[in-house]
Amino acid sequence: MRVTRDMIDPELRAAGVAFGLLFRPSEWFFRFARRVTARAAGSSVAGLDCDERRIPSLDPDVDVRVRIYRSKTRPSESVPGVVFLHGGGYALGTPEQNGPLYETLIGLRSCVVVAPDYRKSLDAPYPAAVNDCYATLRWLKDNAAELGVRDDQLIVMGQSAGGGLAAAVTLMARDRGEVRVAFQLPLYPMIDDRNATDSARDNDAPVWSEKHNRLGWRLYLGGLAADEVPKYAAPARETDYAHLPATATFVGDLDPFRDETIQYVENLRAAGVDVEFRLFERCYHGFDGIRPDSKVGREANAFVAEQFAAAVDSRFAPQADRPKG
């Protein structure tokens, strides 16, 4: 899908072009960008209490740095727990980059956000990241009482590669039977390594193009052959979507991930999963974060806020080792 300037929402054009000029699809630039984004590690959010722990990954002798965000005013009752997985093409980024969003979520409905600094593909390809992220979910469930979290309201959320990890983590949770997830928000998720859809092929949109995507997947999958890629690496390869948690997601119609997101939504619905979905016209990848002040950016962020609040109000999944009620 070739993307021309006039196809892009006027409010998004300049920022998208500028971002695209800076964020180049090369391994050298990914490594440079990773060093830059890593400087945010340890930064706090002014309106929130921020704590940091190191927890064990699924992999032996590996610890994961996790950031824990909560309201400065501690609620008297337990609150939902949110595992938030940041984006960055599986190659870069830190949990600190989403501070304003954590503040928004906690302001909407009191909750505890646990965000892991999962291992990046530049250092450790699949399954490092998903093992770190699933371990974070399991740790949140096992330590819910200490953290003041309701273990029957665990939500998994992420953007882009973080959305892909969210989808993978909920698959693992269903298959392993160790944690029950009440709701997931895998936003414009990176879930299909094959680059075979109409929206992915030849996509030259700003921010994240086919070239970025192929590089991101090559780094993440390491030496895996095409016929060896498992569903926990690329959740679009799953064939059984039954018994996954209720879901909300959105994607822009110029995003390489458009078609894989739509197919994911259709597969979930066909399996009887409740899904809320929005397709935003004339929007490239990550437009909601690049131009949150635009009309369409406000609409996308309002959709997420609405779906998150509704989930907290109505979605529950009691753990298998806990009594109901």
Question: Which sequence ranges carry the predicted segments?
Answer:
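Short beta-strand element of the alpha/beta-hydrolase
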Residues: 78-87
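Short amphipathic alpha-helix adjacent to the substrate-entry channel of hydrolases
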Residues: 96-115
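Hydrolase active-site cap/lid region
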Residues: 171-227
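Short beta-strand/loop motif that positions the catalytic acidic residue
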Residues: 249-251
